[in-house]
């Protein structure tokens, strides 16, 4: 016999077991169930970064550049992945940059290496870029405060990766 929805929900709620919660290190969280929503503590990436190998430039310095009309810039530094530069790019300058490296002050675009040639510190540009080209902006993957996982989520390896990348060391889970 069918019963009204309110009565059915009341019966189900009466049978619910309230589970205890514990806070554990994330290294012990595999195959557990989250007892809280997980929100990001920080932006990812935490800075504007280069989306490819190339040259951090002021886009305006490249306007009009083509295979038939090269523009010329002076190389002032190199930023490898995991490094950063204290230098600020001014008009007429460029910094060689690796994929994933933070965009230096003053730059507003990254010119792909394929559209350049250089000898020593002299850089010839064979193509133009627009502002923001080839830059992954701060928070592109994840913004501070974004919900990453819902409470009651079963924690597998991929969830652990998200939790760790969000900056968590400990989380609340339901006791076994």
What are the functions of these language-model segments?
Residues 1-69:
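Short, low-complexity N-terminal leaders and the immediately following helix N-cap/first helix
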Residues 56-176:
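Short, glycine/charged-enriched hinge/interface segments at domain edges or termini
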